[in-house]
């Protein structure tokens, strides 16, 4: 896995730089990455949005999406990730995806705040 990541991540990063350059005039851009904190991407963005859900819900969703994965497989993956509580603690913004909060209104609120300038958001710099 390490070898694959060492080959893949530089190419993905290079592709992203090109994409970002073509969108440099946008008010803001988003970058999705499941392991932002773990692989250091959090240092290359201005703000972090964490989508948070309890572990039991995350496990159920992965099993529904990837029927070949067992609960134990998923728990092993989660164990190698930064704890959810730490991600939430480090986040600038949190979207709760826990079956108790409606996700779309949270997203629309952030979008409106970013567009209006109510929340200061700087574009990423291409390094």
Regions inferred by a protein language model and the residue ranges of each:
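ATP-dependent small-molecule kinase phosphotransfer cores
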Residues: 1-28
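Short, flexible helix/strand-to-coil boundary loops that buttress conserved ligand/catalytic motifs
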Residues: 5, 62, 107
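Short, flexible, glycine/charge-rich loop motifs used to bind or transfer phosphoryl groups or to couple energy/partner
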Residues: 18-20, 37-40, 83-85
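Switch II (G3) loop of P-loop NTPases
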Residues: 28-38
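Conserved phosphate-donor/acceptor-positioning beta-strand/loop module used by diverse small-molecule
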Residues: 30, 42-65
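Glycine-rich, N-terminal phosphate-binding loop of Rossmann-like dinucleotide-binding domains
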Residues: 33-34, 52-53, 98
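Short glycine-rich, flexible loops that bind phosphorylated cofactors or substrates
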Residues: 38-39, 57, 103
């Amino acid at each position: 896995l390490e070898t694959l990541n060492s080959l893949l991540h530089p190419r993905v990063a290079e592709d992203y730089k090109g994409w970002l350059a073509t969108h440099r005039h946008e008010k803001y851009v988003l970058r999705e990455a499941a392991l932002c904190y773990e692989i250091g991407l959090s240092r290359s963005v201005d703000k972090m949005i964490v989508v948070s859900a309890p572990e039991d819900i995350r496990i159920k969703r992965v099993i529904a999406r990837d029927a070949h994965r067992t609960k134990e497989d998923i728990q092993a993956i989660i164990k190698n990730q930064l704890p959810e509580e730490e991600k939430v603690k480090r986040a600038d913004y949190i979207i709760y995806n826990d079956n108790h909060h409606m996700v779309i209104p949270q997203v629309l609120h952030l979008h409106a705040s970013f567009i209006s300038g109510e929340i200061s958001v700087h574009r990423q710099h291409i390094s």
